[in-house]
Amino acid sequence: MDKSKRPFLKFKRSFRRRLPPIQSGDRIDYRNMSLISRFISEQGKILSRRVNRLTLKQQRLITLAIKQARILSLLPFLNNEKQFERTESTARTTGFKARNK
């Protein structure tokens, strides 16, 4: 094969496999808040399986644990601290408007 006709080969970077987010000793349970809180966004939403890098079974168990913790009031359904601060600061300070008749 001639050098000019050879396909361009990319340089291969070294690849290090990331550690799984859930170790074998971790219990997926609604009471295990340190584990559950890793899989919730800042807004209080459950992160997707692709973001979490979990297996299908692990994601299903995490989702059930989060929902159970929400029902038992261990976790909020929504985390709207930023929205609450905004509505508090934009509250009207003026009195009632005078109506024109």
Curated annotation (Swiss-Prot):
Disulfide pairings: none
Keywords: Chloroplast, Plastid, Ribonucleoprotein, Ribosomal protein, RNA-binding, rRNA-binding
Main location: plastid
Subunit structure, interactors included: Part of the 30S ribosomal subunit.
Keyword Transcription found: no
Protein name (record): Small ribosomal subunit protein bS18c
GO cellular component, as recorded: chloroplast; ribonucleoprotein complex; ribosome
Originating species: Nicotiana tabacum (Common tobacco)
Database matches in InterPro entries: Ribosomal_bS18, Ribosomal_bS18_CS, Ribosomal_bS18_sf
Family under the similarity heading: Belongs to the bacterial ribosomal protein bS18 family.
Location of the protein in the cell: Plastid, Chloroplast
UniProt GO molecular function: rRNA binding; structural constituent of ribosome
GO biological process: translation
Keyword rRNA-binding: yes
